[in-house]
Amino acid sequence: MKRPREPSGSDSESDGPIDVGREGELSQMARPLSTPSPSQMQARKKRRGIIEKRRRDRINSSLSELRRLVPTAFEKQGSSKLEKAEVLQMTVDHLKMLHATGGTGFFDARALAVDFRSIGFRECLTEVIRYLGVLEGPSSRADPVRIRLLSHLNSYAAEMEPSPTPPGPLAFPAWPWSFFHSCPGLSAPSNQLAILGRVPGPMLPNASSLAYPIPGLRAAPLRRAAGTILPARRNLLPSRGASSTRRARPLERPAAPLPAAPSGRATRGSHMAPLLRSPSPVSPGMVGSPAYMAVPAPRPSSPGLAGRPAGAMLCRSWVSEITEVGAF
């Protein structure tokens, strides 16, 4: 089929008719040679789904790393599940805080691992304190073994603390003893802390080491007792009896004679009589609070004790008793 060409503006151009069928062939050659088959379309959709799944996995993995690296997100991880927007917001806040405090923006892997270890140790210590408080009940008398155990764990937590020494004094309360203020049903914190100053022994820290565990703020390192933490059985019973008697008296009581001891302690008084006759020098490590100086008065039936002064006899008897039963 041929059609006549439209007349052009110039009469000098005279071309023949144009073949329409040949134009159709040229247009088909310009198109793609073949359309995609259904199997090819299905394979393309499958590849696209795999790529999308890998992208989501990378996003979730990065969010998990942010939950572990950002301190605020790590603390809230156990309470409830954090959303992605919350994790990103906490990350932004943490980076702003680092920028405001002059941080470099890089994480020290070793310091981060030590910090996580100290956080876990403090959580375990808090759980131990809670369990021992519930197990002992609301009584005002605390076990000396429990006091020594908590003092040892507190000193070990102080050694693990990676934070540097601040220039000024601490502005926050002592830890972990502030746990007693927030837990109802436990014994009074004043009784717990007062017992710490009355229980003698090499494992008892001083007042400066009971503060928040920062190594630079402690006056001297804690001396560890040779052997196990718990005392031997032969020293446990008299020490517990002596410590329970000392806990029953207030700290402010002066060194004065008390009424006669009950009949249950007669054997113990007769056992201590040879030690009372021999003078023993007072070591500087044994000097304690005035509660250590209050002892039962000697009975008139004891021979050989009437001719000695009352003050010297009280001091020497108490020091000899501590020397025999051993510092708990």
Curated annotation (Swiss-Prot):
Record's keyword terms, sorted: Developmental protein, DNA-binding, Notch signaling pathway, Nucleus, Repressor, Transcription, Transcription regulation
GO terms for cellular component: nucleus
Localization per Swiss-Prot or TrEMBL: Nucleus
Main location: nucleus
Positions of the Orange domain: 116-153
Domain bHLH residues, every copy: 43-98
GO biological process, one term: Notch signaling pathway
Region Disordered: start-end pairs: 1-54, 236-272
PROSITE patterns, A to Z: BHLH, ORANGE
Database matches in InterPro entries: bHLH_dom, HES_HEY, HLH_DNA-bd_sf, Orange_dom
UniProt feature coiled coil, ranges: none
GO MF term (any one): RNA polymerase II cis-regulatory region sequence-specific DNA binding
SUPFAM superfamilies associated with the record: HLH, helix-loop-helix DNA-binding domain, Orange domain-like
Gene3D superfamilies reported for this sequence: 6.10.250.980, Helix-loop-helix DNA-binding domain
Record-stated family: Belongs to the HEY family.
Quaternary structure and interacting proteins, as annotated: Self-associates. Interacts with GATA4, GATA6, HES1, HEY1 and HEY2. Interacts with HDAC1, NCOR1 and SIN3A.
Primary role: Downstream effector of Notch signaling which may be required for cardiovascular development. Transcriptional repressor which binds preferentially to the canonical E box sequence 5'-CACGTG-3'. Represses transcription by the cardiac transcriptional activators GATA4 and GATA6.
Name of the protein this chain belongs to: Hairy/enhancer-of-split related with YRPW motif-like protein
Organism of origin: Bos taurus (Bovine)
Gene that specifies this protein: HEYL
